[in-house]
Each structure stands twice: as C-alpha cells, then as structure tokens.
Amino acid sequence: MLNDLNKIAKDTNFFLKKYLRKQKYSGLISPMNYGLFSGGKKIRSKILVDVGKIFNISYKKLITIGAAVECIHAYTLIHDDLPCMDDDDYRRGKLSVHKKFNEAQAILAGDSLHDIAFEILSSSASKK
C-alpha cells in the first residue's frame, strides 16, 4: 500500500509540475509551487485511484482528477493560514505561504490553484 501511495504521489506531483510549467501566472508560480509541494502524502489522490479502479476508470484519468483535487486542497490550506483566518505561521513545519511570500501573493496563489483545478477537470472532461 505504501508503494502504491508513493507511486500515486509521484505521478500526481509529476502531472502538477508539468501542468504548472504551462501556466502564464509567472508571478504566482513560486507561491503556487510552494503551497502545492510543501509536503503531504497526496492521500486524496490515492483514495480517488482506489475508488476509480472499482469503476474501471483509467489510471491516467484518475491521476488527472486527483491532481485537481490536490489543487483544491492546497488552495484551502493556503487560505486557511491567512491572517484573516487562522493566521498560522507554519504549515507542515515550513513557513506558510503568506509568511514565505506575502499575504496578497498567498491569496492570489490560492485563488489560482482553485481556478487551475477546474481548468484541469474541464480539460479532462473534454478528452474522451
């Protein structure tokens, strides 16, 4: 199971890194990367893959959907740490996004990850 989790996390991260390289949000790439890749096991992707196997959904499609879910998760964590919310200085032992960068960049990076999640899902849905 741990090997599966590691493979799914690696594949999800690979998809996300490749996808973010295509983005035009040049000023926000660093805080988005920091928020997305600051640790975490990508357990949501693993759950998605396990459930998707039951319904014979392709692994590639499940990784794509899992990547979108991870973007939503990162967005919620970035926004949760903001001064107007929990005002947390650290997330997973590292400076939170608004502390590493600034509050405005954290808000925009989180919002961008939210948008990217739906962009990933809509492009995935159009590929039959």
Where are the regions that the model predicts?
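N-terminal amphipathic/basic leader segments beginning at the initiator methionine
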Residues: 1-20
